[in-house]
Amino acid sequence: FILADLGVSSMQIDNPERGFSYKYDGPLDLRLNPEAGISAAERLRTVARDELEGMLIENADEPYAKEISQAVTRALRKGKKIDTTFALRDLIAEALDFLPKDEKKEAIKKSCARTFQALRIDVNNEYEVLEAFMEKLPDALAPGGRAAILTFHSGEDRLVKKSMKGL
């Protein structure tokens, strides 16, 4: 039996130095392994507006992907640094400033969570890692063995379901 829990550790999320949460100010990192790859701040500096918009849609189903990606690229063009979690959070809030006052607070909170999720998935190549895991899963299971995979968002869910159909 194989059990795969695809969720992020709360120890990582609750540590401001890891940059996983918009609720705590810290460096905008989001890497599961801080020694590997590039941080989310570095990724934002190199991503094109349309690529960022696609990332927000594909990795997090973000309904305000266009507005957020425009705000991020506009800020970067003006020389603004987006190196901290609060800097990104504030840009998201600015991007959603057009919303009615009674909807804004909740929308900002949800868009922050989705944006941080989308960036985390991107900088850690989480979908590629999950695809590789799913490809190797049949070889790791004993004949007649079972696997349970706990997903936490629709992107993971879609990928796992698609892979399971091929088994």
Where are these regions (language model features)?
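S-adenosyl-L-methionine-dependent methyltransferase catalytic core, i.e., the SAM/SAH-binding region
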Residues: 1-167
